[in-house]
């Protein structure tokens, strides 16, 4: 049974309007002073079970007033904030690398919401008082302790009451984005996904994030590693809240501080720094620490108003699943917003066009980074992101960490099967399972299972019972083994298997057809160009190359002309190609695509399908 500790906080509220006060987040002109007082309580019908001794509760509630109105803030510890193999790395004065695995299980970073408000969220650090933000009635409020001696006072304020550190608008360094026209966005919104595509989009996705802090930023915080750690934890906790609407969960797998010297050349020219960091990730970081994405936080002032840069549509790639972000604000929420923006580029999202908007406040993917933090994704961003996922299907985001890999003490009754548990159907009052003992989280006598595609009436289904049907020509059906409640791992047809009436060949579980690639890039009503276009554009410097080497575009050989730039036909425009971007694969024919009878594209060459794999 889950132990829930509800902590009621009585806040005495003193609206304050006078001279500004200096908080960690900057100068605040208007705020309310509150004094939290903890009152332990149990939920209605709750039973308190012995639990491992921890400093911070898994679940807490705070009651207080906002503008004279009582609210209840519900908080739950962000159990997915750290991965089990989370490490911290710094460097000794002699350059030695020092890597540790600190005990981060009992951390103090929470997500939450205001009770009885559907559109509410919160990200709070409870390490030393309450610090963070919550959304109430469409507006974002910040809370942080007032550093007064012998006082538990906190300040609650809104973003508009914080003095701006710099009036110059900040920008992202990504310039070669392909913003869609209003007409194209409207057409995309009318597309209907297949049931299989909808299932794929609804599956929870995970990014194991590695954060690097450069030497300048380290020195900016008085060479205090603890202060750096706390700042990064808050940022990643906030990043998680911003990505939940996209069904993404971000786990911090490593934090590295270049405490002795920078391990790469960090230049004011942001593109140079991004390239160097990507090469470092590929050659130095990945061989010693797995991760899905790495971000560099730097204390350098990039040229102009730029505060970040990332490659577009490159998640999971060794050299390009990276971003660089200037630590441009005292406020962690501001820098977290920039981290979210650059990660959005890695996830295939370009800058919003003028027709894109958000329900409240600025959009995360606006080309100009707002002075207001804690933005949200526009409908344009959501559509573009989904198109990227369906077109590329990056594999690293699907490897869900095992429950034992999520750092948290097991809690019986929270519906998650954690280490040492055989099942978890909630509290005894809520449990609806005949197979699971809600008090012990163990299976009932003679029960083999509680849930799963291959579990039926507490028993494993017989071997051979189909548990996952083939979704298309390139998929294979899966059957139960008779020994497990889980359906076996999804498998697919061999590469080169003909699909969709011989229009294409299977490649890594997908039937790759050029017309479908055109639709993914341009929307409905588009087809692949006729063969004559590929001949006509063969020597075109923008549309006729097969690869780029040291910045030089290499034309396709005659036999390989169907494996370079993708050409599409829309209306009277018959030979459309796509502009070159920071993503070298954008607008190129995908590997495994049919380029002739019995031929497929591999490494930008049109080769015999019988020998390609």
From Swiss-Prot:
Tissue: Expressed by the venom gland.
Propeptide feature ranges: 21-191
UniProt entry tagged with the keyword NAD: no
GO annotations of cellular component type: extracellular region; plasma membrane
Binding site for Ca(2+) 1: 208, 292, 396, 399
SUPFAM superfamilies: Blood coagulation inhibitor (disintegrin), Metalloproteases ('zincins'), catalytic domain
Record flagged with keyword Protease: yes
Motif (D/ECD-tripeptide): 473-475
CDD domains named among the record's database cross-references: ZnMc_adamalysin_II_like (cd04269)
Signal peptide from the UniProt entry: 1-20
Disintegrin domain: residues covered: 409-495
Disulfide bridges in this chain: 316-396, 356-380, 358-363, 412-441, 423-436, 425-431, 435-458, 449-455, 454-480, 467-487, 474-506, 499-511, 518-568, 533-575, 543-577, 546-556, 563-601, 595-606
Annotated residues for binding of Ca(2+) 3: 475-476, 478, 490
Binding-site list for Zn(2+): 341, 345, 351
Residues bearing glycans: 282, 437, 550, 572
InterPro entries, A to Z: ADAM_Cys-rich, Disintegrin_CS, Disintegrin_dom, Disintegrin_dom_sf, MetalloPept_cat_dom_sf, Peptidase_M12B, Peptidase_M12B_N, Reprolysin_adamalysin
Stretches assigned to the Peptidase M12B domain: 205-401
Role: Snake venom zinc metalloproteinase that may impair hemostasis in the prey.
The name this protein goes by in its record: Zinc metalloproteinase-disintegrin-like MTP8
Source organism: Drysdalia coronoides (White-lipped snake)
């Amino acid at each position: 049974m889950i132990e829930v500790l509800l902590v009621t906080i009585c806040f005495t509220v003193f609206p304050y309007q006078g001279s500004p006060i200096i908080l960690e987040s900057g100068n605040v002109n208007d705020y309310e002073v509150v004094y939290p007082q903890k009152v332990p309580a149990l939920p209605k019908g709750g039973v308190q079970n012995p639990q491992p001794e921890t400093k911070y509760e898994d679940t807490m509630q705070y009651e207080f007033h906002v503008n004279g109105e009582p609210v209840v803030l519900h908080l739950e510890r962000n159990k997915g904030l750290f991965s089990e193999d989370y490490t911290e790395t710094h460097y000794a004065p002699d350059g030695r690398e020092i890597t540790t695995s600190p005990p981060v299980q009992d951390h103090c970073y929470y997500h939450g919401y205001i009770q009885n408000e559907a559109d509410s969220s919160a990200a709070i650090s409870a390490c030393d008082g309450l610090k963070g933000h919550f959304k109430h009635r469409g507006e974002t409020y910040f809370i942080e302790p007032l550093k007064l001696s012998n006082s538990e006072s906190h300040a609650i304020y809104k973003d508009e009451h914080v003095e701006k550190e710099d009036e110059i608008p900040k920008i992202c360094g990504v310039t070669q984005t392909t913003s869609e026209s209003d007409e194209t966005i409207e057409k995309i919104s009318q597309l209907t996904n297949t049931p299989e595509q909808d299932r794929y989009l609804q599956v929870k996705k995970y990014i194991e994030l590695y954060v690097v802090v450069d030497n300048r930023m380290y020195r900016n915080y008085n060479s205090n590693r603890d202060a750096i750690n706390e700042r990064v934890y808050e940022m990643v906790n906030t990043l998680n809240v911003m990505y939940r609407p996209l069904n993404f969960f971000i786990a911090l797998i490593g934090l590295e501080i270049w405490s002795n010297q920078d391990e790469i050349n960090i230049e004011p020219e942001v593109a140079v720094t991004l390239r160097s960091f990507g090469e470092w990730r590929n050659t130095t970081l990945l061989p010693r620490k797995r991760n899905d994405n790495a971000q560099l936080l730097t204390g350098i002032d990039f040229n102009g108003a730029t505060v970040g840069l990332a490659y577009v549509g490159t998640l999971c790639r060794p050299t390009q699943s990276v971003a660089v972000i200037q630590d441009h604000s005292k406020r962690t929420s501001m820098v977290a917003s920039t981290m979210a923006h650059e990660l959005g580029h890695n996830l295939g999202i370009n800058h919003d066009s003028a027709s894109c908007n958000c329900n409240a406040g600025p959009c995360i993917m606006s080309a100009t980074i707002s002075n207001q933090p804690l933005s949200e994704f526009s409908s344009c961003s959501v559509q573009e992101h989904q198109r990227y996922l369906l077109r590329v299907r990056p594999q690293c985001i699907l490897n869900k960490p095992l429950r034992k890999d999520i750092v948290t003490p097991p809690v019986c009754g929270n519906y998650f099967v954690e280490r040492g548990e055989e099942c978890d159907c909630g509290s005894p009052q809520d449990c609806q399972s005949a197979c699971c003992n809600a008090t012990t989280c163990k299976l009932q006598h003679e029960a083999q299972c509680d849930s799963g595609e291959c579990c039926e009436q507490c028993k494993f289904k017989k071997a051979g019972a189909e548990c996952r049907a083939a979704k298309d020509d390139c998929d294979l059906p899966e059957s139960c083994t008779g020994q497990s409640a889980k359906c076996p791992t999804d498998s697919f047809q061999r590469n080169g298997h003909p699909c969709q009436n011989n229009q294409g060949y299977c490649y890594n579980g997908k039937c790759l057809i050029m017309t479908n690639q055109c639709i993914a890039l341009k929307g409905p009503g588009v087809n692949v160009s006729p063969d004559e276009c590929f001949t006509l554009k063969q020597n075109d410097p923008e549309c006729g190359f097969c690869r780029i080497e040291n910045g030089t575009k290499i034309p396709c050989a005659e036999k390989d002309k169907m494996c370079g730039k993708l050409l599409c036909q829309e209306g009277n425009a018959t030979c459309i190609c796509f502009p070159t971007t920071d993503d070298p694969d954008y607008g190129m024919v995908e590997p495994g695509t049919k380029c002739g009878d019995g031929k497929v594209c591999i490494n930008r060459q049109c080769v015999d399908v019988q020998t390609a794999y």
